[in-house]
Amino acid sequence: MKKLAIVFTMLLIAGCSSSQDSANNQIDELGKENNSLFTFRNIQSGLMIHNGLHQHGRETIGWEIVPVKTPEEALVTDQSGWIMIRTPNTDQCLGTPDGRNLLKMTCNSTAKKTLFSLIPSTTGAVQIKSVLSGLCFLDSKNSGLSFETGKCIADFKKPFEVVPQSHLWMLNPLNTESPII
């Protein structure tokens, strides 16, 4: 009887550990399916920072947010850390060669031209700050990559300062057609 209890306990423990491994594998598979591609849309105009559009204006590629190791001293001003906004499965990133204009560039975190910081707001939208210039991207009259820059509204001494809608961007799912099931 004692041997039976020991065998039963060992099987129970072995069964629990393998089910945990199975659960971890399911989570990994879920992560592969949910690849977190975004479009960035301005709150004021709805214009997006597009990456690749097809003939009907739907986004075909989207953007991928890639975290970058942020130096400790930079975390004082960029509390959410630095990111690169990358075209998936490539070495092409959204970048600012001069800190003011947006272009697709080769991803390179050392020159800071492809580094950004997202400044969250209470609305769920964010300001997109260029690490190179310290300026934020604002709404524009033209869709695409031609956006103005301006002073970021992020003073921790004035937490209730209103951020203009032209400064705020939403991270939205891709603007693609849904498949018919």
From Swiss-Prot:
Ricin B-type lectin domain ranges (all copies): 79-181
Protein name per its UniProtKB record: Cytolethal distending toxin subunit C
Oligomer and partners: Heterotrimer of 3 subunits, CdtA, CdtB and CdtC.
Key words of the record: Cell outer membrane, Lectin, Lipoprotein, Membrane, Palmitate, Signal, Toxin, Virulence
Annotated TM spans: none
Any one Gene Ontology cellular component term annotated for this protein: cell outer membrane
Pfam families: CDtoxinA
Protein function: Part of the tripartite complex that is required for the CDT activity. CdtC, along with CdtA, probably forms a heterodimeric subunit required for the delivery of CdtB.
Gene3D superfamilies associated with the record: 2.80.10.50
Major site of localization recorded for this protein: membrane
Subcellular location: Cell outer membrane
Lipidated residues (S-diacylglycerol cysteine): C16
GO molecular function: carbohydrate binding; toxin activity
Membrane topology, record value: Lipid-anchor
Lipid attachment locations (N-palmitoyl cysteine): C16
Segment forming the signal sequence: 1-15
Lineage top rank: taxon: Bacteria
Note, other: The operon of the strain O128:H- / 9142-88 / EPEC is referred to as cdt type II (CDT-II).
